[in-house]
Structure formats: structure tokens, C-alpha cells
């Protein structure tokens, strides 16, 4: 009988599988390297196994998403890890005015293989500034999709 996995373990396993399959996949975010592995341990073990493709960043959501967008523009697959969904607004300029428009600026010839991943919602005791769900903000462009 298979044991029930926590969502964090499932996401971590999925990321490990993606990194094994795609040598052009990069991950950028705050505190995501080992031994910490991110606020929710989703990235645990990735920086040890793939040290050339997993990068911790300064606390600047705008810079994280901007750098990730630049890597994606160069043809790479990129995951930008934002610690909490509430902080997504700080990087929204890069999403709205760079990442989503780039596909149109190149007449559809360029792909932006960019995922901005962030946990949303509460129930963890981090307080009101890290508990909001920001799904409606990602429906501003036809090239931007939100899943949860």
C-alpha cells in the first residue's frame, strides 16, 4: 500500500523529475538552496543534485522574475520561486510588461517557458501579509495562465 504523501513531498518529487528530464531547466528564488530548501521545503535536495541550475537570490521578487524572464527569453525553461503569493505583486511589472508581452513582441516566434511558482493561502501561522490568494491578478494577459 502506498503511503500518503504530503503535497510538499509530491511537488519536490515532481521538480526532481523535471530537472532530470530537462537539462535546460533553471530554478531561482529566495532561500531555496540546501540545507534550507525553501520556506515549505519544496526545493529540498535540488541545489545539491543540480548545483549549476538552482540559484538562491536576494529578496527582490522583481529581480527574481526579471532574471527568470531573461533566462527564458534565451530559450531555457525557468521556474521563479516566490516565497509567498502576497509578494507576487512586487514582481508583477516583470510579468505584465516583460514576460507576457515578449511572445507578442516576437510575433509568436519566441516562447517564454517561464513558471512563477508561489504558495498562496493561510493556515500556517505566518500572519495576514502572507495569507492572501492572488489568482485574479494573473488573468490580465492571454499569454499568462494561472493554475492552483
Indicate where each model-derived feature is located.
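Thiamine diphosphate
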Residues: 1-148
Amino acid at each position: 500500500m502506498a503511503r500518503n504523501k504530503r503535497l510538499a513531498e509530491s511537488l519536490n518529487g515532481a521538480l526532481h523529475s523535471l530537472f532530470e528530464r530537462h537539462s535546460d531547466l533553471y530554478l531561482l528564488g529566495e532561500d531555496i538552496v540546501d540545507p534550507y530548501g525553501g520556506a515549505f521545503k519544496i526545493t529540498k535536495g535540488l541545489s545539491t543534485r543540480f548545483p549549476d541550475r538552482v540559484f538562491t537570490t536576494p529578496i527582490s521578487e522583481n529581480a527574481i522574475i526579471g532574471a527568470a524572464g531573461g533566462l527564458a527569453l534565451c530559450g531555457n525553461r525557468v521556474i521563479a520561486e516566490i516565497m509567498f503569493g502576497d509578494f507576487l505583486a512586487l514582481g508583477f511589472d516583470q510579468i505584465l510588461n516583460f514576460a507576457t508581452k515578449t511572445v507578442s513582441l516576437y510575433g509568436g516566434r519566441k516562447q517564454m517557458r517561464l513558471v512563477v511558482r508561489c504558495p498562496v493561502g493561510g493556515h500556517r501561522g505566518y500572519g495576514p501579509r502572507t495569507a492572501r490568494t492572488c489568482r485574479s491578478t494573473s488573468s490580465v494577459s492571454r499569454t499568462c495562465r494561472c493554475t492552483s
